[in-house]
Amino acid sequence: MDAARMIEERVGGDIAELASMVDPDQEGWSRVALTEVDVEGRQWALKQFRRLGLDARIDPAGNVIGCLQGAIGGRSIMVGSHVDTVPGGGRFDGIVGVVGAIE
């Protein structure tokens, strides 16, 4: 299998896994902030960051933060997104940014 196909399958799998974490009592794809499924999504992101070797944590506000230490004095790259969705949000609400950051 070529590298592009492997990436496609990994990204597709991550999107499907996170998209499956929704509130079954809501329409669409709902992971409303501070609900059980939102916390489940945050824990999923934390696990993914740690799997990649990042120093990862959830801060007091509930933000999932992953850091990979680089060269001292080197440039930094920062990416951000959100695991939660608006009520009844689309399948990719927040997911694309989260999976993009993981990738």
Which residues make up each language-model segment?
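Proline/glycine-enriched tight loop/beta-turn segments at coil->beta junctions
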Residues: A71-S76
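N-terminal capping segment at the start of a domain
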Residues: D2-T35
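Predominant activation on well-ordered alpha-helical scaffold segments within soluble catalytic domains
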Residues: G12-A16, L46, V98-I102
